[in-house]
């Protein structure tokens, strides 16, 4: 019997993301906005768009639309890098901090609800298995 693990994991990510999007809709944000804000927040200040894209694990052109939206919402600013005029640096605005705090609460509550009834040992085991699968895939890609 063929394993459906890949499809199962893909479906899990899809429904998890859809729930996050649903929960963030009242804040006029999406899971993509959250991942971007979270990474800007956790990285050292004034990251370039290239560095941010690498941290998130996406291509820079894919990031630009999300950054445009966050800039339109007044949550980030972008400015030309003094050392490389082709590069843009990203900075959170003062308005972003309370939004990040509120979204963190929504994400934490949602995660807690999703993981309800699953022990910390089970979560640790699943996390370990996912990391091992990822390492196997990376190894295969580098062959």
Swiss-Prot record:
Gene3D superfamilies: Winged helix-like DNA-binding domain superfamily/Winged helix DNA-binding domain (1.10.10.10). SUPFAM superfamilies: Winged helix' DNA-binding domain. The keyword Transcription applies. Residues 49-72 bind DNA. Pfam families: MarR. Residues 2-135 form the HTH marR-type domain. GO terms for molecular function: DNA binding; DNA-binding transcription factor activity. It comes from the Bacteria. Keywords: Activator, DNA-binding, Repressor, Transcription, Transcription regulation. SMART domains: HTH_MARR (SM00347). InterPro entries: HTH_MarR-typ, MarR/SlyA-like, Tscrpt_reg_MarR-type_CS, Tscrpt_reg_SlyA, WH-like_DNA-bd_sf, WH_DNA-bd_sf. One of its GO terms (biological process) is response to stress. Transcription regulator that can specifically activate or repress expression of target genes. Belongs to the SlyA family. Homodimer. This is Transcriptional regulator SlyA. The lineage of its organism: Bacteria, Pseudomonadati, Pseudomonadota, Gammaproteobacteria, Enterobacterales.
């Amino acid at each position: 019997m063929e394993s459906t693990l890949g499809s199962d994991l893909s479906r899990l990510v899809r429904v998890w993301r859809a729930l996050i999007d649903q929960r963030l809709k009242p804040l006029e944000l999406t899971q993509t906005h959250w991942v971007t804000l979270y990474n800007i927040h956790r990285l050292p200040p004034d990251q370039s768009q290239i560095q941010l894209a690498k941290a998130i694990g996406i291509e820079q052109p894919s990031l630009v639309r999300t950054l445009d939206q966050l800039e339109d919402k007044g949550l980030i600013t972008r400015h030309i890098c003094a050392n490389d005029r082709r590069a843009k640096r990203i900075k959170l605005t003062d308005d972003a901090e309370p939004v990040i705090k509120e979204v963190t609460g929504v994400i934490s509550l949602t995660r807690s609800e999703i993981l309800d009834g699953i022990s910390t040992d089970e979560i640790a085991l699943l996390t370990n298995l996912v990391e091992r699968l990822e390492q196997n895939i990376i190894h295969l890609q580098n062959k």
